[in-house]
Amino acid sequence: MTLTPMEDKGIIPNFNDFKRQLAELLQSRSTVEDITLLQGFLQLVHSKTQQWRGAEGLPATPDLLDAVWKEIHYPIFKWFQQWRAHLLEAAEGGPQERTYISFRRMNGKLNKIFKIIRQFYNGLVQQLFDRYDFGKLLPAGVIRELNVQSGGELQTLDDSSYFTILCVMSLQRCLLYLGCCHRYKCCCSKLSKRFHISDFDDSMRYFMLAKQIVPSVGETYLQEGLVYVQTGNYGHAAYAFMRGSLSRMPTDAGIPNLESIVADASSGLFAKHQGILKRLRSKESDSNKLINREVLEFYFLALFSSVYAPESWSKQGSDIRHCTEILFEKVRSRYARNVRLILQDVLLFIGGFDLVIKKAKAMGLNRSDTLPSNCTAFLETAFDFFSHVIDSVVLKEWQSFDTWEYLALVRVICVWIKSHSIVTQFAHRHTQFCQSVAHLLNNILAHTEYQQLMDVEHRPKRDYFFQEDIMLKDFSAIGHTLSDFNDVDLFQMENLPDRLAGLVDDKLTAKEEGLLKLHAIVFIGKKFLANNDVNIVWCDESKRFNSLKPDVPLRTCSPPKAKTPPPSTSDYTPAGAKQTKKSKPKRNSRRVQSLSSLEAKLMERKGLRQSVAEGRVYSGCSVPAAPMSFDVAPSAHLYQDRAAGTSATQEAATYYNQGYNGPMQLGSTEILNSRSPSGNNRIAFHPSHQAYMQMIQTPQPQAWPTAYGHNAYYSQPTQHPYPMSSQLAQFQNGPIPFVAGPYAMYMPPPGPGMVVLNNGHPMIPNESPPQQHYP
């Protein structure tokens, strides 16, 4: 096989020969008996790969690494995963002693193959550091964590060149695939089906390093989410999938995986989440058995799911209202050891709204000036939760500076409101949230130690990123960074990579950092309350925000532009039965004639939620055995029902990644108070197959391209099986079918023409790149 350098003809190595040889090996009984055949094959592939050199002698480019993983390493790991599944199936009806012996033999062969693959990626990492100086691009702490030895004269990488992008992205790929290798090894090396997060410490370490180097790649979050799926932590998995789909370089598999947990009732993960909720409900009578962390993870996920995909959850057999009450009580009483999880819940609401808006846009519901009622219900639930968190957690602990999450909760919420016009308009009309923010600011300004914050007129400055800023790098729902600080001077300082990682010698104390954060919170909070629509105003005499009184007339606004949609003609009873509304709507009607009546209903929203929540019900933990055929890639979503046709989560992958050209205008005051969609305005979260066919373009045949360019990246996970013959692989305990699906890494088109690295600089190449146009 001939490997042509990229700079000569722009052709990447063709792995067709290797793919054919691998298919023959994996379907041969001799490979099972003698693993040295597979070892020799891997050594040959690695040797040929390392002989190829990219631009300026780069050991490997990101595309070359993607090809090696997709065509060689990933099918091998899936082969071992299938072997393990076969042994587990045989163990159910056969002698246990024979199963253990077979498993030890399989595990020994897996360890030999794993060492060869790990050595390949570690060797490439060492080669990169042997040739190039990453000091201007990576934090010193990350380089120390990699434990690489640099020697001799190194080429300094310029953070404005295209070649630097290739070097950094190649390093990121090596770390990402090292994490994937450790994940598959852990999954295959245990005979038990139960896993703990500590089993994947090595995988999570490499994923964390990959995020620190290039935080904008969503694939890293996707792989973290797959780890959490394996351990049964579906709340953490949902957050990771959301982050992966809302990164600057998103993965198209994030949304389908998320919906497998929270929206697709036919998914195995959805059913497992329901089972966990039923198990927790049975433990509520005994407080000693009910684990607070499980409530904050799984009960919150049920609340989030009920407004993210109400059509899927309205048919379940449990009460969301009861679940919400238990959740709110645990937030109020058990937040101290779970504040990081509460912050994650807040972020899931923030990211989830972006996904709901994208879904509404894809369904063509942004053509009017009215915010869809599904989006309104989502915001209402989210801000109820935010208000409760501020009142029950932040108001008590805002001076506990040693725990950075308390002030981070307020910073994240306020920045999100400021960066999204739809959310801003809604938040200005949410009475309880405005009151919560006003009470928090009053408490801060009433403290004698912080009197100087009363007259702040500018955002504060700082010399390095704080922990929450590092955590939320390239999170598109908040504008890719927390913007409540003025960081213009920061980006001009020396040792910028270390500063953006929070690794500086002259680091402030926790209290000094807290004072800067309070400055930012007071500034952005006063800006927010200056335009509220619930009549909370600043009093110059008392230097406080006044308290909202029900008898104070509310500020009026212009009437909505769009026509008021008709009220729903039907609703659900607590049992799920459909009933026809008989007469004129009563106090809980969703028709609002003026802003004053809207605010009155917002003040009574607890009563409103009581009537509507009765119609919302929910009801889900271990990981199933490996599938009997591999017709999905690791980036693809889980638990597709092939026999039933295309699943809802599979259909959702296409329209979620459509461009989002900005938020819609909120023009209707009637729709703001609507807790659930009416019959005529409900968003179909699982539209019909015909409706999807009108939105989804016909997929093109996917094959590894012969040249660099836009076609060099897969726009979606491949649905075509790995080309292998139909011969059955022979195992010691009998034949077992094998079809491996290729791995497809989604890389979006380089629209902005830049990659943001960990040093914060947008990488806009000054030179004309080779034929490859890498984002």
Swiss-Prot record:
One of its GO terms (molecular function) is telomeric DNA binding. Residues 579-590 have a biased composition (Basic residues). Residues 550-597 are annotated as: Disordered. The keyword Zinc does not apply. The keyword Nucleus applies. It is found in: Nucleus; Chromosome, Telomere. Gene3D superfamilies: Tetratricopeptide repeat domain. GO terms for cellular component: chromosome, telomeric region; telomerase holoenzyme complex. SUPFAM superfamilies: TPR-like. GO terms for biological process: nuclear-transcribed mRNA catabolic process, nonsense-mediated decay. It comes from the Eukaryota. Pfam families: EST1, EST1_DNA_bind. Keywords: Chromosome, Nucleus, Telomere. Involved in telomere maintenance. PANTHER family: NONSENSE-MEDIATED MRNA DECAY FACTOR EBS1-RELATED, SMG-7 SUPPRESSOR WITH MORPHOLOGICAL EFFECT ON GENITALIA PROTEIN 7. Belongs to the EST1 family. This is Protein EBS1. The gene is EBS1.
